[in-house]
């Protein structure tokens, strides 16, 4: 089994003798994930817990939650759920934050209930296809290297809690085959059919064209993102050292004079990573290019406003960043 082989290669992904919390929507990807994890449960001595987030986005939300709950009870799988307030999930970003907030709270609760089987892993059903969609979307928006390495296999989201995506080695066609082979129920989310949403348009219209031209294009795009991830980690380490070298007199500043002595591409890497370490969550490659151009040698003092009430300003000697909320 492919997942079992991957877990043997990287034992830290899903440690044995622990509780793992699966985010299950009821769609084909999450149901395939649930089946694969349940099959490996006894071998790895896992306590498997299910969490379902009811966004109440459509008329079938309640029915999906109830049917999924009954299916889990029938199969002796522990089930948990939360219902969202409409204000909490007004858009996809808020909905994602709501899901992770509730998943983290549930993981902490499960750990407190069983200290011998702590819940240190939260699993989602993201696949290679999801990763390819994200790469295409970020490329179209304009991104730096970090934007091409999103949807990592594992990342820490809270102290002692990692978000793990075991299905990145599968594409969406393969998760559908798993569901068919094992006669698993699938609950369709109507919101995934709305092509006015960017990701859905990529999923329904763009990726199928790429896959028809180059069979398995989604998996190969995801594979490129995986290879770039390693390169990106090396770049971050380099940037950390470079930022220390270019540190200004104040903690929220960089020496503009030191930046002058570096190449254009290195300056952009330093600026991008510095802004992220200072708390700027949304920054495009075009914005980095604009900042880099405006702070280059012989350019006059100035300022630029960024997302999240951040302000970058510069004079002859240094570049500063501040936030109105601080």
UniProtKB/Swiss-Prot annotation:
GO terms for cellular component: cytoplasm. Its main location: cytoplasm. The keyword Mitochondrion does not apply. It is found in: Cytoplasm. One of its GO terms (biological process) is tRNA modification. ATP binds at residues 25-30. It is an enzyme of class 6 (ligase). Keywords: ATP-binding, Cytoplasm, Ligase, Nucleotide-binding, tRNA processing. It catalyses: cytidine(34) in tRNA(Ile2) + L-lysine + ATP = lysidine(34) in tRNA(Ile2) + AMP + diphosphate + H(+). One of its GO terms (molecular function) is ATP binding. InterPro entries: Rossmann-like_a/b/a_fold, TilS/TtcA_N, tRNA_Ile_lys_synt, tRNA_Ile_lys_synt_N. It comes from the Bacteria. The keyword tRNA processing applies. Its EC number is 6.3.4.19. The N-terminal region contains the highly conserved SGGXDS motif, predicted to be a P-loop motif involved in ATP binding. Ligates lysine onto the cytidine present at position 34 of the AUA codon-specific tRNA(Ile) that contains the anticodon CAU, in an ATP-dependent manner. Cytidine is converted to lysidine, thus changing the amino acid specificity of the tRNA from methionine to isoleucine. NCBIfam families: lysidine_TilS_N. Belongs to the tRNA(Ile)-lysidine synthase family. This is tRNA(Ile)-lysidine synthase. The gene is tilS.
